[in-house]
């Protein structure tokens, strides 16, 4: 019989403590395991590259900082909670019975012990994680150096601002935040414990603060105000890096109003702190309350209103005169910070003011004979098609420039390493075994003289001519005596042409940048050539022969095959972190690296050269700049492509040259600026990691380049800071700007024109010199104002020359020259005719000072057949602009002749009748083997002529199913065979 009663609810069973602990341990493992795997594999990697000291120093520093910050923050938080519980009222009568806290008093009391543990631990962990990120600041402070240069206001060495001030700021800000947390804990805690009661107007109950609560809050607030006193003192120095509308640094208002205001507020803050401490003994809280009101009013009146009034009524009406001294300080400091002082930069005023004859221009052989026709930004597809060999090899989208001597003369070359392209692997090549154990490395070094092509391309429809003349050193050419001798004569013959490390190799879109190499016991398995395999013998790589290491890397890359595959044996090693720039940044975490990495040949080995910068966030009166914005141009619209230690800088030096071996990944760092105090500080942090500059070999020094990113930053600064008069600086009328790139694709022409590496006449000696150059236009004007060059030659490295054009005459700027060239009748006619079946590419528009006083513009035009996947650019025409005249021809010599310059010094080829050929592409990977298309030589008899025609016909038939380029070459070969036969009759 039902009673109608509802059974009592069953109590919820809690899971056993063992289960809770198991889940907690699993969660902890999931959280810590990835960090542990990364830590262990990185530790192995640093050992491989012999930079484990860097890894250890960084880890130890971060751990120590974590512990220090965690202990201090945890102790301060615990102490605040301890005093809350110690000073809480003992009686329940301390509570307002209407307060919502009243009914929870017992629950709060029961939770005290747990809260006293959880909150300090949480705050400690948070503070430790934040604090350990400041390891660079701490190490710089411990190893700081004097600059030998003092600021213009306080007379303190720049070393104080670079090394000491950031550390003092870190301490002050950290203490301030900890005390704020302690104050909030005390405030909330005493309210919950009944030590603080809000008044109740309905019951007439007054607000109440217990003596204990008043004491704790007053002491905490007083300590915070003392930290604020220190903050006001440090604020004085921060004024020197303040960014104003016209310049960076303390202005007239800052020095005459803000600086005294900081001192006054400092004194007031000290009295406020004393007032807070007085509340310990006085029951009346009105004294600290009035002190706080005084502090706030003083901040508004003295810290804001007074400077504002001085600025409005004294400075603004006379700004040019009032700010003159401080603008001069900004000019001096900025020039020092960016290495553009008068000691670093030579200005040639009124360059070109005199008359320069065409004969003088023609005699400028150092420039005229080295005019660059090959654009490294355009020719990557051409290199790929003609020098790829196999589908899995490739070249970067932007090739590099270097220089070599040819017959005793300096020439610039487009250079590239033939790398493995993991993103080009097809079908079964992408299988894990093939990708990571077979296709492991690239092959060879390619160089093409930048002022030459194989043959003149006069007809846009012909497949002959307009292509680079390559010098190659790879596994295949080393086996052929003639090609090996060519490479050796140029100085690029490599004893070890295999490329295991490079930016393209490391560009895998899935992030799986690694290769597994070593003897597996079954013989060589790595692809080397069509007829041979290879086993890696270099020192690079981390041992994964033991199961622990293998398991760790399997976890790192989430790849089970590492544990199961027979290709991984006891002698196996894993090569990873293969991007040269990333390797340098990892072993030198204090360096910012240049965005351009380039290959060269040193001591018979392919080496990657990486430029490293030491930077500072700011220096007194130095204008700050964004590295991302400064490096943006038409070629790099997004600026430097990798994360930076800091984007905004106020000081930069190219203090380190780094070299990465393409075969074994060895990283070498060389000191390159012996005067840089920042580098000296970092060498103190990481001793024996940077080699002395004296250890740079002559061969390496001959291939060092003035870095592009630094040059871009300096040209941005020189656009303004070429002005040394404060009055002129204030009016802006002598500022320059970097012109846009008129040859860029639609939508990018307003982006800055990139600088170009060229071989041209040295501004001082007139001898051939490898330089980085850029033009300047007037501010918001298109006329040319100046021309800047930086030398890369070993003897004159780093010398910057700025040719300043006369202001009483005008010289056409790059955009005006481009408009004139493209609007000339013949150019416009050809462009209209050719664009139907060809893509036309405007090459680099070079602005070349010639003859000691004239400007010559040169621009190559490239054509590429439309709608053909296998088509690639070739040089079709050369445009020149000189003294308002346009030259337009298939060769630079003809184009120069059209504008009145004798081309006898122009490096040019002779159009060979019937013997010139395009570089062979017979090694290019295809689906079916096709006979190579050969070019017959001129026959000497009727029988030989007939035989040559028959051979050409056979090759034409064989090439029918090949690419358009192969078929076109076969047609050309047939035409030449017929011509040769007819000429022999």
UniProtKB/Swiss-Prot annotation:
The chain crosses the membrane at residues 19-39, 63-83, 115-135, 176-196, 215-235, 262-282, 290-310. The keyword Membrane applies. Residues 904-944 are annotated as: Disordered. It is a multi-pass membrane protein. It comes from the Bacteria. Coiled coil: none annotated. Keywords: Cell membrane, Membrane, Transmembrane, Transmembrane helix. The keyword Cell membrane applies. Belongs to the UPF0182 family. This is UPF0182 protein Cgl0786/cg0896. It comes from Corynebacterium glutamicum (strain ATCC 13032 / DSM 20300 / JCM 1318 / BCRC 11384 / CCUG 27702 / LMG 3730 / NBRC 12168 / NCIMB 10025 / NRRL B-2784 / 534).
């Amino acid at each position: 019989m039902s009673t109608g009663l509802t059974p009592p609810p069953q109590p919820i069973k809690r899971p056993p403590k063992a289960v809770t602990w198991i889940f907690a341990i699993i969660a902890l493992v999931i959280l810590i395991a990835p960090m542990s795997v990364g830590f262990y594999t990185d530790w192995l990697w640093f050992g491989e590259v012999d930079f484990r000291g860097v890894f250890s120093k960084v880890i130890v520093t971060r751990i120590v900082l974590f512990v220090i910050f965690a202990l201090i923050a945890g102790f301060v938080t615990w102490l605040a909670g301890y005093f809350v519980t110690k000073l809480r009222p003992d009686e329940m009568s301390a509570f307002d019975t209407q307060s919502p806290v009243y009914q929870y008093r017992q629950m709060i009391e029961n939770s005290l012990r747990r809260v006293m543990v959880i909150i300090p631990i949480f705050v400690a962990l948070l503070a430790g994680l934040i604090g350990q990120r400041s390891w660079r600041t701490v190490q710089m402070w411990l190893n700081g150096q004097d600059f030998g240069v003092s600021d213009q206001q306080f007379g303190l060495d720049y070393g104080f601002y670079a090394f000491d001030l950031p550390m003092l700021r870190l301490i002050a800000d950290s203490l301030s935040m900890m005390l704020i947390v302690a104050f909030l804990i005390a405030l909330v805690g005493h309210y919950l414990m009944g030590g603080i009661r809000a008044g109740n107007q309905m019951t007439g109950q007054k607000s109440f603060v217990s003596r204990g609560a008043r004491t704790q809050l007053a002491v905490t607030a007083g300590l915070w105000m003392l930290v604020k006193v220190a903050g006001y003192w440090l604020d004085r120095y921060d004024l020197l890096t303040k960014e104003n509308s016209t310049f960076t640094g303390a202005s007239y208002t800052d020095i005459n109003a803000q600086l005294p205001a900081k001192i006054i507020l400092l004194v007031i803050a000290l009295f406020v702190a004393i007032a807070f401490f007085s509340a310990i003994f006085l029951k009346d809280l009105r004294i600290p309350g009035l002190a706080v009101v005084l502090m706030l009013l003083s901040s508004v009146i003295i810290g804001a209103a007074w400077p504002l009034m001085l600025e409005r009524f004294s400075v603004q009406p006379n700004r040019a005169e009032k700010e003159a001294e401080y603008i001069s300080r900004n000019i001096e400091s900025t020039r020092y910070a960016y290495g553009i002082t008068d000691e670093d930069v030579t200005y040639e005023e009124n360059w070109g003011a005199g008359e320069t004859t065409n004969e003088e221009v023609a005699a400028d052989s150092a420039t005229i004979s080295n005019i660059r026709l090959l654009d490294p930004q355009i020719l990557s597809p051409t290199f790929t098609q003609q020098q790829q060999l196999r589908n899995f090899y490739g070249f970067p989208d932007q090739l590099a420039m270097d220089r070599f001597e040819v017959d005793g003369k300096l020439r610039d070359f487009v250079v590239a390493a033939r790398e493995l392209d993991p993103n080009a692997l097809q079908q079964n090549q992408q299988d894990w075994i093939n990708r990571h154990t077979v296709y492991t490395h690239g092959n060879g070094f390619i160089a093409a003289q930048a002022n030459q092509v194989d043959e003149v391309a006069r007809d846009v429809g012909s497949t002959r001519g307009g292509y680079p003349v390559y010098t190659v050193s790879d596994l295949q050419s080393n086996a052929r005596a003639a090609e090996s001798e060519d490479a050796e004569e140029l100085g690029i013959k490599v004893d070890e042409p295999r490329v295991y490390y490079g930016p393209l190799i490391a560009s895998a879109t899935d992030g799986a940048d690694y290769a597994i190499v070593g003897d597996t016991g079954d013989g060589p398995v790595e692809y080397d050539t069509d007829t041979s395999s290879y086993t890696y013998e270099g020192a690079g790589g981390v041992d994964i022969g033991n199961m622990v290491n293998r398991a760790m890397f399997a976890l790192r890359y989430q790849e089970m095959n590492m544990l199961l595959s027979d290709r991984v044996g006891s002698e196996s090693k894993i090569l990873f972190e293969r991007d040269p720039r990333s390797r340098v940044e990892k072993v030198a975490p204090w360096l910012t690296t240049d965005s351009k990495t380039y290959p060269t040949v040193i001591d018979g080995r392919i080496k990657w050269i990486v430029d490293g910068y030491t930077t500072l966030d700011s220096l007194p009166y130095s204008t700050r700049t964004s590295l991302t914005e400064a490096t943006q141009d038409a070629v790099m619209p997004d600026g430097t492509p990798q994360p930076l230690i800091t984007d905004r800088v106020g000081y930069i030096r190219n203090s380190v040259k780094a070299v990465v071996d393409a075969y074994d990944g060895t990283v070498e760092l060389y000191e390159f600026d012996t005067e840089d105090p920042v580098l000296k500080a970092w060498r103190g942090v990481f001793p024996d990691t940077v080699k002395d500059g004296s250890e740079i070999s002559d061969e390496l020094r001959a291939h060092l380049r003035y870095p592009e990113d630094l040059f871009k930053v300096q040209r941005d600064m020189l656009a303004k800071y070429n002005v040394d008069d404060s009055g002129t600086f204030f009016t802006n009328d002598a500022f320059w700007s970097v012109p846009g790139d008129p040859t860029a694709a639609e939508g990018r022409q307003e982006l800055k024109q990139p600088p170009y590496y060229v071989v041209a006449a040295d501004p001082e000696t007139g001898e051939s010199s490898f330089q980085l150059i850029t033009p300047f236009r007037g501010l918001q004007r298109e006329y040319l104002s100046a021309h800047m060059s930086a030398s890369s030659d070993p003897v004159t490295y780093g010398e910057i020359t700025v040719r300043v054009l006369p202001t009483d005459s005008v010289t056409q700027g790059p955009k005006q020259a481009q408009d004139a060239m493209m609007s000339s009748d013949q150019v416009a006619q050809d462009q209209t005719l050719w664009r139907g079946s060809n893509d036309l590419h405007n090459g680099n528009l070079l602005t070349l000072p010639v003859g000691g006083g004239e400007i010559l513009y040169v621009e190559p035009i490239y054509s590429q057949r439309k709608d053909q996947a296998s088509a690639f650019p070739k040089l079709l025409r050369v445009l020149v602009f000189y003294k308002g005249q346009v030259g337009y021809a298939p060769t630079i010599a003809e184009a120069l002749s059209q504008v009145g310059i004798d081309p006898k010094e122009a490096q040019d080829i002779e159009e060979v009748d019937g013997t010139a050929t395009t570089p062979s592409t017979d090694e290019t990977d295809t689906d079916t083997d096709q006979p190579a298309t050969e070019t017959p030589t001129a026959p000497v008899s009727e029988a030989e002529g007939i035989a040559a025609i028959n051979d050409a016909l056979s090759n034409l038939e064989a090439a029918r199913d090949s690419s358009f380029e192969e078929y076109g070459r076969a047609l050309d070969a047939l035409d030449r065979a017929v011509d040769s036969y007819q000429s022999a009759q």
